Amino acid sequence: MSAFCRDCLADARAGAKRCATCGSLRLLAHDELDSLAIAHMDCDAFYAAIEKRDNPELRDKPVIVGGGSRRGVVSTACYVARIDGVRSAMPMFKALELCPKAVVIKPNFAKYTAAAKAIRGMMLELTPQVEPLSLDEAFLDLSGTQMLHGLAPAKLMARLAKRIEIEVGITVSIGLSFNKFLAKLASELDKPRGFAVIGEAEAVAFLRDKPVGFIRGAGAALQARLAKDGITHIGQIQDMAAKDLARRYGNTGLWLHHLAHAQDSRKVDPDGELKSISSETTFDTNIAKFEDLEAVLWRQAERVSARAKASGHGGRTVVLKLKTAGFRTRTRSVSLDSPTQLADRIFRTAREALRREADGTAFRLLGVGISQLAPDTDCDPADLVDDGSAKRAATERAMDKVRAKFGGEAVVKGRAARSALRR
């Protein structure tokens, strides 16, 4: 059995409790440690971790990052808040009922994207096969990298985690396995600051006693349907023939059969997964006036732009989303001549759609996004017709640099200030 220290990377004796070189208790041991190459890395409570990094007084306090109003939602909760049951996407009023002493912080996407970009760069130093899932998580295929770096994938990931702690100031959790399904599952087993391994020899047995919900993508509706048929654990799926599962559940049944047997043929795809980038907010009170909606739209466009720039993408389509006071959703899409990642262009495009929708109807939610993503090298070419577009683009990129260095509120456009006054 192979074993090493996650702190100094020194090899360790199997069964040892402490590193003989540095004294660390963080030893990792597994029979397949030297051969597994598919990793999933997830930043621990990312937004909250960045806020705690920048404000040491928050270190031991329950921190919630999200909309500051009771009608908002939780973006991220730190692990102290999670002890009280607070979870991402939970309504803020519910989170504060569970954790009334929580410190609520509005998101600072300029800060988060700067950290994400730094981490992404570190990943790419190890392998070009990095598939981002969001700002704070990604798959890595480290096959063949040992010849380049002189370390097995497991040690490369441990070294990466340590480097992120030192240079970015946050912790990450890592899962290592032989396919994406199990690597992601492994990364969730030992949070925070964890490193878990699921080998090929143990995978099917490991899954056997796990609830069906452990299968990524088996949502509440599918779980309820399976439970109605008496299927609550993965082992029950393993015991069924593929043809019986297909007959009962169609293609979903075959998908369940493969994953229950630890089979996942998906490759780590640097261009995969990310299909759109969006941001939305729920208002404290319903808004009907165009001018008020316009100010909120700018703030959301800035957030989408920041995420797009961090991911290295732009979008060919701008999408506006509105939800009425009666919970009816309106979605409008506008196609562009060339993809964009600029907040100004996203805002101007969505504003025209908003102008047509702002007919006196009271809205409780507004969102904007981009889809049909393209690499940032294809985004925002010089506009020979609109002389002002180049100046606006240059101004925006200058503002990005200031915000990344001094924080998201270092430079605020008039539109954003009006948005803050109206909230």
Name the predicted role of every residue range.
Residues 1-256, 268, 306, 389-423:
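Gly/Gly-Pro- and Ser/Thr-rich, intrinsically disordered tail segments characteristic of DNA damage-repair
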Residues 1-2, 31-32, 40, 207, ...:
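DNA-contacting surface of Y-family translesion DNA polymerases
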Residues 44-46, 69-72, 325-329, 373-376:
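Short, charged/polar surface micro-motifs in flexible loops or helix N-caps
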Residues 68, 89-92, 188, 266, ...:
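N-proximal short alpha-helices
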Residues 99-101, 142, 323-326, 377:
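Short acidic-glycine loop/turn motifs at beta-strand connectors
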Residues 104, 328-333, 377-380:
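Short small-residue beta-strand/loop micro-motif enriched in glycine and branched aliphatics
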Residues 176-181, 259-262, 314-325, 363-374, ...:
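A glycine-rich phosphate-binding loop feature that marks nucleotide/adenosyl-phosphate handling sites
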Residues 223, 336-423:
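Acidic, metal-coordinating catalytic segment for phosphate/diphosphate chemistry
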